[in-house]
A protein has these predicted regions:
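Catalytic core of nucleotidyl cyclases, primarily class III adenylyl/guanylyl cyclases
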Residues: 90-115, 134-165
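Juxtacatalytic helix/coil linker segments
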Residues: 1-90
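Surface-exposed beta-strand edges and their flanking turn/coil or helix-capping segments
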Residues: 65-66, 118-119, 165
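Serine endopeptidase catalytic core focused on the charge-relay Asp
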Residues: 126
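Non-membrane alpha-helical structural segments and their capping/turn regions in soluble enzymes
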Residues: 73, 77, 113-120
């Protein structure tokens, strides 16, 4: 992948410093999906166009078997944090975290082409951040580097209200 074609990330040095701090001290941000829930609640009983981005760590099952649980959990924390931050930078919402994956929504209510572009650009930046910021820090600590798979699709969904039990 030609990184010169990718949109610029504001400050890779700051991203790498945050990754380093997360490896040392744990997650540095709120990883809740509350903003996505608010987005969906405002659209209860409406059909909403979205682009769905699915991002996961390639080979994570083997990695989870080879690493001590605390090391694997730390890698998942870094991955989840950095992918979540990039998602929000591109106007997306994290719908949920599923093991080693993140499912994100990009609203396509007004411009599905722009939503698709945002999701694709987000995926490109995710690849770049993994390659240029996350992997050097992991390798420096004797941990395996990550390869990330990204897939997207466009959908119409209907948000419905679910009563709390």
């Amino acid at each position: 992948m030609n990184s010169s074609l990718l949109p610029p990330v504001r400050d890779l040095t700051a991203v790498q410093a945050r990754v380093r701090q997360t490896l040392d001290k744990g997650v540095q941000i709120d990883l809740s999906t509350e903003s996505c829930k608010r987005f969906l609640r405002r659209r209860v009983n409406q059909k909403v166009g979205v682009v769905i981005l699915y991002v996961d760590i390639d080979g994570s099952t083997k990695m989870s078997m080879a690493l001590p649980p605390d090391k694997f959990a730390t890698i998942l924390h870094v991955f989840s944090q950095e992918m979540s931050l990039i998602t929000s930078e591109y106007g997306g919402y994290v719908l949920k975290y599923v093991g080693d994956a993140i499912i994100a929504l990009f609203p396509a209510e007004y411009d599905s082409g722009q939503a698709s572009k945002n999701a694709v650009d987000c995926a490109k930046d995710m690849q770049r951040i993994i390659k240029e910021c996350v992997n050097p820090e992991l390798i420096g600590r004797g941990l395996p580097q990550l390869t990330v798979k990204c897939r997207s699709t466009t959908a119409m969904c209907k948000s419905c209200s679910m009563a709390r039990v």
